[in-house]
Amino acid sequence: HKVLNDLTVDDWAIIIGGDSHTRMSKGVAFGADSGTVAIALATGEVTMPIPDSVKVTFKGEMMPYMDFRDVVHATQAQMLDNFNGENIFQGRIIEVHIGTLIADEAFTFTDWTAEMKAKASICISDSDALIDSLEIAKERIKVMIDKGMDNSLFVLQGLVNKADKRISEIKSGLKKPLFPDSDAKYYAEFEVNLD
């Protein structure tokens, strides 16, 4: 489902889902109870408290033998070490800044933040990283199209077209990637060392 999320949800979206593991590769997604989700579906609106954010950046290089479980465990272990055992992620929004992770890795990382007890997560990227992520997702969809998996409504081709439109918006400056305000305040800031 991640590939579809890469193309159907843009980086400005706010998503409400009925699962604590509701995460998207772009935008910010909140897990909520069924009543809150029902109200959101019925009215298009929802009221919920927005928690503080924790800014997470990465330095170093991910080793070829590492996968995202290693990154998740390293992130959690280093965070606990740096904050004297306090889980600063619990109940907060993790704002993932790409740093040295490539776009696809960073967007995948946000999906794992539920394991860190975060309320939500969002990936902050620059224009080039966001375009790279959209291009990766497009190529995966094109493989499905080439294998004859599109339907008579050309839903898969529509996803490719949507990605092309978003790429055009980014390149033209019409709708830049979501980025925090220059004076954004955080509960904490934390850098993960991948070395």
Question: PLM features: residue spans?
Answer:
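Fe-S-dependent hydro-lyases/dehydratases of central metabolism
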Residues: 1-195
